[in-house]
Amino acid sequence: MGLPKGPEGQGLPEVETREDEEQNVKLTEILELLVAAGYFRARIKGLSPFDKVVGGMTWCITTCSFDVDVDLLFQENSTIGQKIALSEKIVSVLPRMKCPHQLEPHQIQGMDFIHIFPVVQWLVKRAIETKEEMGDYIRSYSISQFQKTYSLPEDDDFIKRKDKAIQTVVDLSDAYKPRRKYRRQQGAEELLDEESRVHSTLLEYGRRHGFSRQSKTEKAEDKKTALAAGLSAAEKTDAHEEDELQAAEEQRIQSLMTKMTAMANEESRLTASSVGQIVGLCSAEIKQIVSEYEGKQSELSAEESPEKLGTSQLHQRKVISLNKQILQKTKHLEELQANHTSLQAKYSDKKKTLTELKNHGEKLDQEQAALEKLEAKADPSILQNLRALVAMNESLKSQEQEFKAHCREEMARLQQEIEILKAERAPGEKTISSGEPQGALTSTMTHNEDLDRRYNMEKEKLYKIRLLQARRNREIAILHRKIDEVPSRAELIQYQKRFIELYRQISAVHKETKQFFTLYNTLDDKKVYLEKEISLLNSIHENFSQAMASPAARDQFLRQMEQIVEGIKQSRMKMEKKKQENKMRRDQLNDQYLELLEKQRLYFKTVKEFKEEGRKNELLLSKIKAKAS
């Protein structure tokens, strides 16, 4: 892709590019990366590869929160200096972003996509990471702002149960906290060793610490087992010492207990009769408290172990999640419908524009064909007549200019003669008055009348010539207008290019609209099938218990299920058949497309050969003319 050469044949400095398959593959991969990252401007077919790649790199850099001093929004087809300046500004930002790949401005300007690809790949990756970070930040910020103003039903329920649960825990801790049952008597001797003080404190709160006292039956059983096992004398001695230590410990505890008195407040123990009276009087309140305690315990167990929920709660959660999914799908469907409506309106406008352009093109083709027929039929005579009229127009214009100049000269001469006659007439009158003869006066009057007559004749002649010239000019203007109405070869080529561009744009919009139609129909069918499935499952769930109540109802229910399954199988077979038909149609269209591609290739090959033969023909004609001269 070099620059045009100068008049001396020396070319300007060219930028080396590798226009091979690898470059095209890399360009395609770069554009796919940019589109996948969200830069949909790369899809526009009218933009050059430089604008797409540089615009995509700038978009990635700005997405990563880095500033680039460029303006690429509506400045396309820039000069080489502007392209190099843009490339230098982009390259200067890459080191600040800590890009691991090296890139030079001339590589961007020269479209060296092999070296541009790793940089674009890194920029796209960085842009996607930045977008994810910003998305997480915006999501957390949105959640925090939402929680400042609104709250979910689950949060409201938790807040309502929170105070109740805290009060329950406090009540339980108060109910089961350690309570003092005994108190040391005043005037009792002070305990000196730490172990005795610990035992005394534990005994005050009703807790015994030390050897547990075994019953006589347990001791007898231990002795029997020991004798049956044949214990030795040493083991008997150890058992006896252990009994003595236990007896001493019990005696010490009893001595400590004798020095304590029972508490005489509300914490003291109640008798059996008082307990019976309280239970008889407050049985309803006790039942209510027990039921509240069981409810709190069930709520706490549900919060602590959600995996142990019942089937009804699990079903309710599933229903809530399904309702949320249905709302999301409905919202998505509304967005698709709105997008479909806008695209349908655009498609209608484009289709109308295409129809108008086609009609105008057909009209132009008809007029061109009619003019070509007229030119083929009466080309020589019309052209000769046109040339004669143009030459006549030019000659009449020159004659008009000459005649105007001649008339001015004649008018000046006549005015001069009139002045002379006026000057001569004054002394003539004097002679008449003096009694001279009247012959001179008569000759002068005759000469004046002759001049007036000649002047009127020339004036009438000029008027007729002007009328003739105006008629000829009108005819020439009509012919010029007819000639201008016929488009030239360059204009026809421009019309053709523009029609091709419009056709490509309309075909792209049409293809995209068809894709949206297909997606919408697919989602609509999916929605219909899901609704049918949900209604079927709901009806099965509602009628299952009734159907299982009796054998006749169960048989009828099974028959209905078999009919439903058979209908589903038939629907599936229809869809499979439709799928096979679409597949066969796709294969046929693919074969037709391949045939058309082969014809197009043959057409291009034939055109190329025809151009080559035409070039050879021109060379031969030039050689023949050179030899003839």
Swiss-Prot record:
Pfam family, one: CCDC93_N
Region (Sufficient for interaction with CCDC22): 1-428
Membrane spanning residue stretches: none
Signal peptide coordinates: none
InterPro entries with a match to the protein in the record: CCDC93, CCDC93_CC, CCDC93_N
Disordered: region residues: 1-23, 209-246
Residue numbers bearing the Phosphoserine modification: S298, S301, S305
Biological process according to GO: endocytic recycling; Golgi to plasma membrane transport; protein transport
PANTHER family with a match to the protein in the record: COILED-COIL DOMAIN-CONTAINING PROTEIN 93, FIDIPIDINE
Family affiliation: Belongs to the CCDC93 family.
This protein's name: Coiled-coil domain-containing protein 93
Gene: Ccdc93
